[in-house]
Amino acid sequence: MTISRFIATAAVLMLACAHACAADFRSVGAPSVVLYDAPTVKGGKRYIAPHGMPVEILARYGDWVKLRDVDGETAWAESKGLSARRNVVVKAAFARVRAAADDNAPILMTADKGVLLELVDPQVSDWVRVRHQDGIAGFVRAAEIWGI
């Protein structure tokens, strides 16, 4: 194998891995979802996840998914309680939602740590377009939120 062919093959494999390894986020779609320590209703109940809470899917086992929350806690939940709708949560002390993806754009609102925002568009560079439940939509820095 020539060096150029080796490099081309390595590049294709890295791109495939990056796609396969991309984080899979969902949000709690049911009014609430019970999270367990094992993939069965006979497992110990860890806590109740509220509607809209963003979660990262780590693994799938039948009708169950292993999840991670914003605090890094892991648990199991029935997949039927999750929604493909994407929400994010503010992880910084506060996040400024701006009119455009620019630090000099007008601030539309400030969201405190823990506030849920709907993900409107996928991440573009360092910014993400979000919407608050009050209808205010704008851009927030990706580093200030969790769930993307």
Place the predicted regions along the sequence by residue.
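Bacterial N-terminal signal peptides
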Residues: 7-18
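SH3-family beta-barrel domains
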Residues: 18-38, 45-53, 58-101, 106-116, ...
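Positively charged n-region of N-terminal signal peptides that target proteins for export
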Residues: 1-6
